[in-house]
Amino acid sequence: MGEGPGYECSGNKLRNIFPSLFTEYSLISMTNYEIADHFSLLSKLMDIHGENSFKSKSYSNAAFNIEKLPKEIREMDDAELFSVRGIGENTGQKIKELVTTGKLSQLEKLLATTPEGILEMLQIKGLGPKKIAVIWKEMSIETLGELEYACNENRLAAVKGFGAKTQENVLQSIRYYQQNQGFHLWAEVEAIANAIMPQLQKAYPNNLFSLTGGIRRQLETVEWIDIISDLDKEKVKAQFETIADTAIEEEPNERLIVKMPNQPTLKFHLTDTTHYYTNLFTSTGSEEFMSAFFDKYQLPEAAKSEEEIFSTNGLQYIPAAMRETADILQKAADNSLNEIIKAEDIKGIIHSHSTWSDGLNTLEQMAKAAIDKGFEYLVISDHSQVAFYANGLSAERVAAQHQEIDTLNDKLKPFKIFKSIEADILGDGNLDYNSRVLETFDLVIASVHSNLKMSLDKAMDRVLTAVSNPYTTILGHPTGRLLLSRAGYPLDHKKVIDACAENNVVIEINAHPRRLDIDWRWIEYAMERGVLLSIDPDAHSVNGFNDVYYGAMIAQKGGLTAKNNLSSFTLAEFENFLEKYKEKKRSKVFA
């Protein structure tokens, strides 16, 4: 399908703000996520324009339900579509319009009367549709630049419903958004790169191709996809110049920039075959790494592999993911690099949610999917009671869930489900639930979910109090960050890690591609202090199990080993860990 022409009405920037509206897909390939994006935007624009709030809410609910459907709408007949919860006659007809024409006429009309800057405000944390409506209709502000200026002039604080605190938060969010324009999550660009590279290799089977730069180093966010090849420049151009709206630019040093619509930029590093591996090596490492390398070592004239480059210089091979700092070269010189973790090393799923709280799949479905994927155990950690927005479990529901787990464990042996909870760290640092309830869990993941805008002192008091709680087993997503969207609250990482070492608390590496939290830069220090880490998917569906791959990739950057990763423990090792942990916990509780 081509682009919906009506969506052009708000200008080209709309492509960048809501790329799913412009994705070139055939009608039969429109996914549930793309359909949900359209309805979510429709709901928000209706609220901004002050239209029927009941209908707006129904479209918002439809977007939420569509995104979580286990089956693609394109595979449903009318009877199946209209039986989906929250999809009535009106919404169902709009879905049919969207999947048959590629656009929504009602959304087109709203986009035609909405300034680009207002649409862009939807990307700013802390600004919902109703606040945006006030900014637009009452303050006559239509761009982010105008809004930033108004904040600097202290005008937003004077508007009813905002205040000084909201104004400061909005200003920070605008600056964070602007700083991150042009960056992409590694998980997103890796998927695109994995589609492009085989096509190139198939088209030119006798040439060499490799990812390089930040994407090869598995950085959590990257600006573009770096590719090195010995392919002729004109052939690279020919491969892409037939794609509509694609711009190709030449740069010095045999670089070619390919800019395709709604895709990350491709940066080709072109080289002759003789120097392919030396150029692969030099284009992979960070500036700090390469500077340190050239201070002490030499490149062989025509290396046949990267391994040869390292061995010629008396260095242990350094995986591409770890070529960030100068320090890693000294470890390679000392032959002290350990084998880093792989996704296959993960034996169990720790941190997952079911339909008991805000998950998509039932507990049994989660367990059976884990079995099918070869995992030995599942730690189910639904949200605690204070998380009302996520259907958090009351004490009574905790007891009922534990009964279901007991039943399933009898049924699914030798696979085992462990009783856990993602307990909210409250404002004072205490955990949700009293000790009688906390005692019933096999392990507790303690996480901050509310009041994320904290000073360093407040954040440290809150987190350290939770870490010192004898029932805390794992500190979940320690900073609360959302990559390219929300900066984490401030922490003194060393003090937090030291406290985890003192209290035998595991630190989570949340594997969700938008979290990857704790930051990989602190993994080495945690291991030095004897702190276990745990690559956990924070899975809210069976598909979420796949995120352990991204957790393993980011953990490689910090040099994490399987023996230092809790989720790499076998079932027997994990049970032994929990038993020893409970003994230590009891000694603290009754001390």
Indicate residue ranges for each PLM-predicted region.
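Active-site catalytic microenvironments in core metabolic enzymes, especially phosphate/sugar-handling
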Residues: S420-A423, Y550
